[in-house]
């Protein structure tokens, strides 16, 4: 499996959230996966849970296609720039709040999580 043929906005959000969880502490804890599913559902409240699950599976395969974390981070930053251009301020803030929720999901916030959030904040808040 590879990059979804026509990735939706939800796929892109899932990619960023999964990349965050993958590269910041190296382990995707069950609590983090549950939180990702919940925040994705918040973006598309009427979606069936099976749709959210499919997006997660496809996006996880996509994240795993990259050779290393540097490539994953570069792509996540590219998508953050796209979000900055296409989302309103409230939506961009929601992305950042969701990252904070993910950081807290496993009960510990690491320096790498703080650094990732700071980097995406700088990108998303750049006018």
Locate predicted features.
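Small-residue-enriched hydrophobic alpha-helices in membranes
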Residues: 1-23, 27-127
């Amino acid at each position: 499996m590879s990059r979804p043929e026509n990735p939706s906005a939800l796929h892109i959000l899932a990619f960023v959230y999964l990349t965050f969880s993958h590269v910041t502490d190296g382990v995707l804890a069950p609590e983090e996966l549950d939180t990702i599913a919940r925040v994705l559902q918040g973006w598309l409240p009427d979606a069936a849970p099976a749709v959210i699950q499919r997006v997660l599976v496809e996006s996880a395969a996509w994240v795993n296609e990259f050779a290393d974390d540097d490539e994953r981070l570069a792509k996540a930053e590219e998508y953050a720039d796209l979000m900055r251009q296409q989302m309103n301020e409230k939506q961009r803030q929601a992305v950042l709040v969701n990252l904070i929720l993910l950081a807290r999901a496993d009960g510990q916030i690491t320096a790498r999580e703080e650094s990732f959030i700071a980097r995406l904040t700088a990108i998303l808040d750049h006018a």
